[in-house]
Amino acid sequence: MLLIINNIINNDVPTPWGVYFQDSATPNHEGIIELHDNIMFYLVLILCLVSWLLFSIVKDGSKNPLPHKYLVHGQTIEIIWTILPALVLLVIAFPSFILLYLCDEVISPAMTIKAIGLQWYWKYEYSDFINDSGETIEFESYVIPEDLLEDGQLPLLDTDTSIVCPVNTHIRFIVSAADVIHDFAVPSLGIKIDACPGRLNQVSALIQREGVYYGQCSELCGVAHSAMPIKVEAVSLKEFLTWLNEQ
């Protein structure tokens, strides 16, 4: 029964004392988790090796304080401990650069959503769509005060309006700010990008499963920095078109 529940319930929100990633909903986030796990495996091996070497040196040194008193240099060992770490860094850097390039690449998006950070709320614009009055669809998103939260809503995470996106659709987020530097971050989507005044940054996402994903402004932006949550609702294409018609 527990295995069935674990396969259905996804970890898409921050949890108290959480130390690992939220469940991935995009290929970018899957790549980040895979890269982290692979690198962490080798880092643990290196940590164990270095710890064993230090322990051996301290242990042998306590028995004989001057085991090699006539040894003044060791070119071989110096070459080894210079080249080996450099190779390790190259092995780590190469897949990191590939993933970084793929996360930044935006190719033929099906739709674009603009996110503008302000003190202390977000403004969203669907520039590819217009309403009945001929204007682009845009709205502001504010955090719900704790005294107005309903059952099941999360403090400092739920908002009065949310970004609605269709699943299995290439989406481009264009991020900027109107006052100070903010940061648009949604962990489950593998998105974290600065919102800078006078500058347009972009990032893409391909959401692969329906759900509600939460994020926050991740750049200290003032006294109400913690009151800038981000809520993304991923729905089917049919539900997304229905939502568009209601705007």
From Swiss-Prot:
What Pfam families does its record include?
Answer: COX2, COX2_TM
Entry's cofactor comment: Binds a dinuclear copper A center per subunit.
Its membrane topology is listed as: Multi-pass membrane protein
Gene Ontology MF annotations: copper ion binding; cytochrome-c oxidase activity
The listed locations are: Mitochondrion inner membrane
Q: Which residues lie on this side of the membrane: Mitochondrial matrix?
A: 60-78
State its cofactor.
Cu cation
Keywords, in A-Z order: Copper, Electron transport, Magnesium, Membrane, Metal-binding, Mitochondrion, Mitochondrion inner membrane, Respiratory chain, Signal, Translocase, Transmembrane, Transmembrane helix, Transport
Q: Which domain of life is it from?
A: Eukaryota
The record ties this protein, via SUPFAM superfamilies, to: Cupredoxins, Cytochrome c oxidase subunit II-like, transmembrane region
Q: Where does Mg(2+) bind?
A: E219
Q: Residues that bind Cu cation A2, according to the entry? A: C217, E219, C221, H225
What does the record say about PTM? The signal sequence of COX2 is processed by IMP1.
Give the EC number(s) under which this enzyme is classified: 7.1.1.9
**Which residues hold Cu cation A1?**
H182, C217, C221, M228
Q: Where is the signal peptide?
A: 1-11
- Please give the function described in this protein's UniProt entry: Component of the cytochrome c oxidase, the last enzyme in the mitochondrial electron transport chain which drives oxidative phosphorylation. The respiratory chain contains 3 multisubunit complexes succinate dehydrogenase (complex II, CII), ubiquinol-cytochrome c oxidoreductase (cytochrome b-c1 complex, complex III, CIII) and cytochrome c oxidase (complex IV, CIV), that cooperate to transfer electrons derived from NADH and succinate to molecular oxygen, creating an electrochemical gradient over the inner membrane that drives transmembrane transport and the ATP synthase.
Name of the protein described by the UniProt record: Cytochrome c oxidase subunit 2
Q: Cite the source lineage.
A: Eukaryota, Fungi, Dikarya, Ascomycota, Saccharomycotina
User: What would be the name of the gene that encodes this protein?
Assistant: COX2
